[in-house]
Amino acid sequence: MNEITFYPTYTKVSNYEKGSNTYIERSLSVWDKATFSYTFEGYRIDEDGNLYIPGGFDKGVIENNFKNHTVRDLRVDYFDIPRKNEGIEMKFKPRDEIQEKSLQFLADSKYDMDAYQKFLSLKTGQGKTFCAVSYVSFSKRIPMIFVHNKNLADQWFERILDFTNLEKENVYLISGSKSVDKLYKMSKDERADIKFYIAIHATIDSLYKKDSNFISELFNKLDISVKIFDEAHLRWENILNVDFNTNCRSIYLTATEGRSDPAEDRVYKSIFKMAPKFSDNSRKIKEKPKRYHNVVIYKYKSNPDPEFMAAFMSKSARRGFNINFYTEYITTQRFKEFYEPLKKFILKAVYPESMGYIRKTMILVKQVELLERLYEELSNDLFGRNITIAKKHSKMTKSEKEENDIEKADLIITTDSSMGTGSDIKGLEMVISTIPTSSDIVTTQILGRLRYIENMNVYFVDYVDISFDKCKKQLSSRINKVYKKHALTIKEL
């Protein structure tokens, strides 16, 4: 029987001989006039005479070109996932409407057959990586992220750790055959701890050429349920090899929606024609100023003693600034030095008598222990001033959560990881971040937590300990890489 069968990311046509339908073949091939030959063919024919066509190619065109074939659509059979990817929590919410609508696009139409392939095209810096990681978190799918070089793989590795609650052991890099051998030797329980797989195209391509069953066997072994292709305008051949050999959905990411060469661009657009697409121009994004944050840099000194500095340098020797060790030091040894300038600022900026109202504010800290101590001290010192204080963190009991209504509170104290959960806080006018970080991506996402409010100034306060050279260097990096690019004003106190 002659059949056309639709799968999530490819279409299979049975009983096909090469050259029997030149229209389909030419539509998916790049012809080089200089060498008088095809340099790329976006289809495959296996030894059993099955033609494989990209899932994004126009299905109406396929049916019209094979009218004597019966049609079967098996895409819905692959909707369910083999194993849920539990326990991934985002530290941050989408920072703007572009990220919000990008995530809506990735989540929408989950029962729509065309939703198995989605194309997200955002400019560099608009948050493709963040959106992809967020999608994995809420969809609970086990991803394999494909990149074309080690530098990109390292960037993904860092961003996953920046954006989520995961540790290094929860992310696995597939680079070289030895990394695959190591995976296969792991027990099922060991692999269960891996939440993200990042694969180098060259490694997958090399092993696939040695064994045509490699890709499908790898995906089945790891329970992969979503493919994410970064820089999807590159490495076409391997992208198609992966799509032709797997039956889970694909997300294609790129800042470049097309190819510069006209012949290549024609084929590129044919391959992804039916895949739903979203870019910053796809839907109407509400007009708002690109710069609306007023950044205030508030410096203080914790004055560490030589004994602590020696211990801190030792703890920070291997992985850089040890933020947990530093935060414990602030909580247990230098809380007064940390707290008094902060309290003074809060009384002046959050509750200024001249304003006649309280400025809704969020304070970000790194650890729950520091949060609890700060909450207790502020509750005592601000008692009787008609300021409602609430806290939010992962260790709160059910009764504590009920008692702390952050929507109604004037002053909210939370951790960076807890900040990423829940809905946006309406009317938030100020964020005070006490978290040392050198990551411009993390800083940008935290900055984005403060939304534009029409006819109102909003403030982002960078509360920084200048007793540490590393903290000063981090601040300099944040100023140059983030604040100068995104802030309306920058003021140092």
Please provide the spans of the model-predicted regions.
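Conserved Walker A/P-loop ATP-binding site and its immediately adjacent core
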Residues: 130-131, 138-163, 366-371
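Conserved interdomain linker/interface between the two RecA-like ATPase lobes of SF2 helicase motors
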Residues: 277-361
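Conserved helicase ATPase core of P-loop NTP-dependent helicases/translocases
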Residues: 181-187, 373, 386-417
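Conserved helix-turn-beta segment of the N-terminal RecA-like "Helicase ATP-binding" lobe
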Residues: 152-178, 381-384
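Post-DEXD/H (motif II) to motif III coupling segment of the RecA-like Helicase ATP-binding lobe
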Residues: 226, 231-292
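Conserved SF2 helicase motif VI
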Residues: 438-457
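Walker A/P-loop
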Residues: 112-135
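A short beta-strand element within the Helicase C-terminal
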Residues: 423-436, 458-462
